[in-house]
């Protein structure tokens, strides 16, 4: 696969993930729904999570901060999977988004997944 194709796939996935995180963050900032508030604990926690999702999106999109954005998005979604699992809620959607984030990271930053040793 050539570099141009990798970039197109990487940025397309970045746009999709950015859209998902932005929509979710804005939904949480607007108040969400009662079930979500009960699962998270309080309205304050929900607003904090919404702001966190928007910050992750802002870090994910630019090339210079994209690596940190990918790492933060991976960790955030892993936490979301754990919360859904403990609350006995379906985890298929969050696992799907987590897989998209990993694939996005692979196409945008293949060095994150290489087995080459970095010289000290």
Where on the chain are the PLM-derived regions?
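Membrane-interface extramembranous regions
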Residues: 2-120
């Amino acid at each position: 696969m050539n570099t141009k194709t990798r970039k197109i796939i990487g940025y397309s996935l970045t746009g999709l993930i950015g859209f998902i995180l932005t929509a979710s963050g804005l939904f949480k900032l607007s108040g969400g729904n009662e079930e979500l508030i009960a699962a998270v604990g309080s309205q304050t926690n929900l607003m904090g999570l919404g702001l966190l999702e928007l910050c992750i999106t802002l870090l994910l999109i630019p090339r210079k901060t994209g690596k940190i954005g990918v790492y933060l998005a991976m960790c955030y979604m892993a936490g979301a999977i754990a919360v859904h699992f403990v609350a006995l809620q379906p985890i298929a959607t969050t696992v799907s988004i987590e897989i998209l984030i990993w694939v996005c990271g692979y196409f945008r930053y293949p060095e994150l997944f290489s087995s080459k040793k970095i010289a000290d």
